[in-house]
Amino acid sequence: MRASKNSLSPTIQMRSSGFTLIELMVTIAVLAIIVGIAAPSISTQLANQRVKATANTLANALKEAKVESVIRRQEVAMTYRSSSTPNAIIAQDANDVVLFTYPIHQKSSVTINPSTAGTVTFRPNKIITSDKDVVYTVCDSGSSNETPKQVRINKVANISIINSGSC
């Protein structure tokens, strides 16, 4: 004989009807603990990705300006503007004509050393006009645990990215 659901006693029907409130609360509590542990590391990872993306954007913009100065056979100046919205790095030719603009993420903070080198000028002979190396240090204003990166330009216009610096 087959037993149908309707022929079962009411106490058995209630027992097999689903999750209890306690089981649901325990599941939610465990989930909250897991999310609480994972959330800080995710925010640090996102900050590191923003720093990496900004450093790569700066390096690519500088490399493009270096190539443009050789192709055009004139100086090309790169200026980082933190006062504009969004922050940007702008390339201009010798006649102050804007060649290209790269936006920088708003949560990224960039400091330049030496501070007087707000503009880096590339010459057609593949050197920069500055007598000193120029270093852009990239940090993230939304996090204090990120790994800062530096974009370095030496006198002969070699551009490199390193994991260094302090925020």
Model-based region annotation:
Residues 44-77:
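Membrane-proximal N-terminal amphipathic helix
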Residues 71, 82-84, 142:
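A generic beta-sheet turn/junction motif
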Residues 25-41:
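Alpha-helical hydrophobic helix detector
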Residues 131-142:
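Right-handed beta-helix
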Residues 145-147:
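Short, small/polar residue-rich loop motifs at catalytic or cofactor-binding pockets
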Residues 1-19, 160:
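N-terminal leader/signal peptides at the extreme start of proteins
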Residues 75-133, 150-155, 160-167:
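Type IV pilin-like appendage domain
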Residues 17, 23-26, 47:
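Internal alpha-helical transmembrane segments of multi-pass membrane proteins, especially GPCRs
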